[in-house]
Amino acid sequence: MSVLQVLHYPDERLRTIATPVETVDAEIRRIIDDMFETMYAEEGIGLAATQVDIHQRIVVIDVSETRNERLVLINPELLEKSGETGIEEGCLSIPEQRALVPRAEKVKIKALDYNGRPFELQADDLLAICIQHEMDHLIGKLFVDYLSPLKRQRIRQKVEKLDKQKARTK
């Protein structure tokens, strides 16, 4: 397994619409394993393949405090959503920035698991929010897209400044 490079906003590759996974094979499972390693190394709770420049419909999530409840979503589809909620969301592709984003309180999805088996899942609370956030990545949408142009511009400037500072220290 290896840690993959996470793309940072405003990288245009984050706007790529992911394509469905045709076959869940050893290569897809290797990508999933690398995505989990990357997500844990970056201290995230979710990661979409788009964020690591792999443009296939793959999401990994672990919202547990113990970091041992891995959820794999291959070709996820939203079946139902209800209620309204929102929290200050962060994103590995938008480091050190947070903003309140409106989301559905509950979702029902269908997807394929790590072995390519279909399943359905009903989720609420943080898991529902995380699923919606990561599924947005698969269609090239970021949490900043829910914000005003002014807030989006400020976040972009902060992220670009952070990236320049990190580049100087390498």
Swiss-Prot record:
- How is the cofactor bound, in the record's words? Binds 1 Fe(2+) ion.
Which residues are listed for Fe cation binding in this entry? Answer: 91, 133, 137
Active-site residues (renumbered): 134
InterPro entries attached here? Answer: Peptide_deformylase (IPR023635), Peptide_deformylase_sf (IPR036821)
Needed co-factor(s): Fe(2+)
What EC number(s) does its UniProt record assign?
3.5.1.88
GO terms, biological process: co-translational protein modification; translation
Q: Which reaction does it catalyse?
A: N-terminal N-formyl-L-methionyl-[peptide] + H2O = N-terminal L-methionyl-[peptide] + formate
Where does the source fall among the domains of life?
Bacteria
Broad class of enzyme this protein falls into = hydrolase
Q: Name one GO molecular function term.
A: peptide deformylase activity
Q: Which UniProt keywords apply?
A: Hydrolase, Iron, Metal-binding, Protein biosynthesis
Q: What is the purpose of this protein?
A: Removes the formyl group from the N-terminal Met of newly synthesized proteins. Requires at least a dipeptide for an efficient rate of reaction. N-terminal L-methionine is a prerequisite for activity but the enzyme has broad specificity at other positions.
The cross-references to NCBIfam families, in alphabetical order and at most eight, read: pept_deformyl, PRK00150.1-3
As for family, the record states: Belongs to the polypeptide deformylase family.
Name by which UniProt lists this protein: Peptide deformylase
